């Protein structure tokens, strides 16, 4: 009985996805759509927006970085939420 219980515990641990990795878009302005799998423990995606002499620039990725004045940022917490 103990062997069966131990076997069930081991199988459960092996079969469970013990870690979840967030997927975020990571392309820049006017680039083809690409995604990246965020590092373990990273649970946020971001999009930043700013203007330069060529127009609106957009950057996307994992995390929620601090930005300088004049740069807008949106952070979110679900897969591919930063498009």
Curated annotation (Swiss-Prot):
GO terms for cellular component: extracellular region. Pfam families: Toxin_cobra-type. It comes from the Eukaryota. Residues 1-21 form the signal peptide. GO terms for molecular function: toxin activity. Belongs to the three-finger toxin family. Short-chain subfamily. This is Weak neurotoxin WNTX33.
């Amino acid at each position: 009985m103990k062997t069966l219980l131990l076997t069930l515990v081991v199988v459960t641990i092996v079969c469970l996805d013990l870690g979840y990795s967030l997927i975020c878009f990571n392309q820049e302005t006017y680039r083809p759509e690409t995604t990246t799998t965020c590092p373990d423990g990273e649970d946020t995606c971001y999009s930043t927006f700013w203007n330069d002499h060529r127009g609106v620039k957009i950057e996307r990725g994992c995390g929620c970085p601090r930005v300088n004045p004049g740069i807008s940022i949106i952070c979110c917490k679900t897969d591919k939420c930063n498009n």
